[in-house]
């Protein structure tokens, strides 16, 4: 019985390989920006609250690519500071998407006022924390406020979390 099953499986994979192992997917690349110099990170969120997904990018600055809903994007600069990682999250609980970003020596967040304007806030800016590479937000301590998690590479090799106290300040 085992030989019959193996023979059947070999026969079907040789005779009908496209039906069993092949799926016909079509992926088409669309350019959002051709000027995102040294882009390192992207995140998607409805930044402007209009119902379509926008794109954030971390590179020599932090950019927001506003989706107009018809596959066209308008570029906005959130910060002129370089960023190795960006993440969209409502940090202040006001219903709009803020942006968290990390760079070589700092982690910051950019408060969205709901009209496309962003105020800069520093979470961590320590000279000894060189090499922040990744940033994320979640409610680590389950107090209802989104906290920030950041990972750094050499020489620190640390993963840190910063507690959001609910008043737009972060404790180390």
Model-derived regions: residue spans:
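Positively charged n-region of N-terminal signal peptides that target proteins for export
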Residues: 1-4
